[in-house]
Amino acid sequence: KVHRGDLVVEGNIESNQKLIVLGNLTVKGNISTFSLSNPWVILGNVTATNIVADSPLLITGSINASGLVFIDSYYDNPSTIKGSINARGIFINDIIAPVVASSTNSEFMVRASDKHDTENVKKALMIINPDAYYWGLINDEDALKEIFKRSNIRMAGNVCNQMKKEALFRPKPSPE
């Protein structure tokens, strides 16, 4: 699909289709994409509540989410965000194909490619509902180091399920 001009969508988007927007994309809800071969090209900014992208992204502006941004980048399908990513929390899985963003502004940012970033993983554990990113509770330092050896697809699936429940974040941060 190609949309000329700004596009505003009331409610959530779940898609495995290609999308080209020649302007800004504003979704008054959540965005969930799940196709390795169908990219989203947005020639402007993207705004939504939560964003989980398994599709390659090319965004010439910024991503603005009041909640979570989860970008999964596979093989030869990298994602590029020319502007910044502004969200409460950011998960990026770019083990093979890079996700390039100009800057980030969030309470935490976790890159799955950095297995030693336990500080940001701990921040995520404190404010994200456990079901949203992991299917069990993580109680010790060794488990933190193992978190991204799990299936990222399953992790993204759990995030999508929590998006439907609108419960990505804990009511209040857990104690350290």
Indicate residue ranges for each PLM-predicted region:
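Long terminal segments
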Residues: 76-176
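Acidic (E/D-rich), amphipathic helical modules within compact regulatory domains
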Residues: 37-38
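Extracellular beta-strand solenoids
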Residues: 2-3, 9, 15, 21, ...
